[in-house]
């Protein structure tokens, strides 16, 4: 496949050894007081979509598993664990996604994908409480998305 005359290919990891790979990504969803209260109440919508935090956690886990389908150069790898932590603060929600694998390539993109989808899902779950009079989101935003840790360890 070419793009602009250049050859594109997925990185060949055949010669790499299998290692334990861990990555953690974190980010923040800034919300209004009404949005934070909607998260705290466990009710995402007057018509009942479910608990915003639990739905966002499930979405994050599913997104981690779907990363190779969404990010073209990510290898399909054996994910051995996903932990999603959510902390509700007075001005929004902090989320972190930690991904573990035994493989030949890292899991940073998987952690980032899980995090972003988790935060977007959380926004979707409480958007009714975030809209202003014109139906806009002047205060709601996703911030500080980053990889906070990457670990590579030899398999025992």
Swiss-Prot record:
Gene3D superfamilies in the record: Molybdopterin cofactor biosynthesis C (MoaC) domain
NCBIfam families in UniProt: PRK12343.1
SUPFAM superfamilies in UniProt: Molybdenum cofactor biosynthesis protein C, MoaC
Catalytic activity line of the entry: (8S)-3',8-cyclo-7,8-dihydroguanosine 5'-triphosphate = cyclic pyranopterin phosphate + diphosphate
Keyword DNA repair (UniProt): no
Binding positions for substrate per the UniProt entry: 109-110
Pathway(s) annotated for this protein in UniProt: Cofactor biosynthesis; molybdopterin biosynthesis
Family: Belongs to the MoaC family.
Gene Ontology terms describing biological process: Mo-molybdopterin cofactor biosynthetic process
Quaternary structure (record): Homohexamer; trimer of dimers.
Active site as annotated: 124
Molecular function, one GO term: cyclic pyranopterin monophosphate synthase activity
The protein's Enzyme Commission number: 4.6.1.17
Top-level enzyme category: lyase
Organismal lineage: Archaea, Methanobacteriati, Methanobacteriota, Methanomada group, Methanopyri
Protein name: Probable cyclic pyranopterin monophosphate synthase
């Amino acid at each position: 496949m070419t793009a602009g005359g250049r050859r594109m290919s997925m990185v060949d990891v055949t010669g790499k050894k299998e290692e334990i790979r861990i990555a953690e990504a974190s980010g923040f969803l800034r919300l209004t007081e009404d949005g934070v209260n909607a998260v705290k109440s466990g009710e995402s919508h007057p018509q009942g979509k479910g608990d915003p935090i639990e739905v966002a956690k499930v979405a994050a886990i599913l997104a981690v598993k779907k990363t190779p389908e969404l990010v073209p150069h990510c290898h399909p790898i054996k994910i051995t664990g996903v932990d999603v932590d959510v902390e509700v603060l007075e001005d929004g929600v902090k989320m972190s996604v930690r991904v573990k694998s035994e493989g030949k390539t890292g899991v940073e993109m998987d952690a980032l994908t899980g995090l972003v989808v988790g935060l977007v899902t959380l926004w979707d779950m409480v958007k009714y409480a975030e809209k202003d009079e014109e139906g806009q989101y002047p205060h709601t935003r996703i911030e500080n998305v980053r990889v906070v840790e990457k670990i590579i360890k030899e398999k025992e």
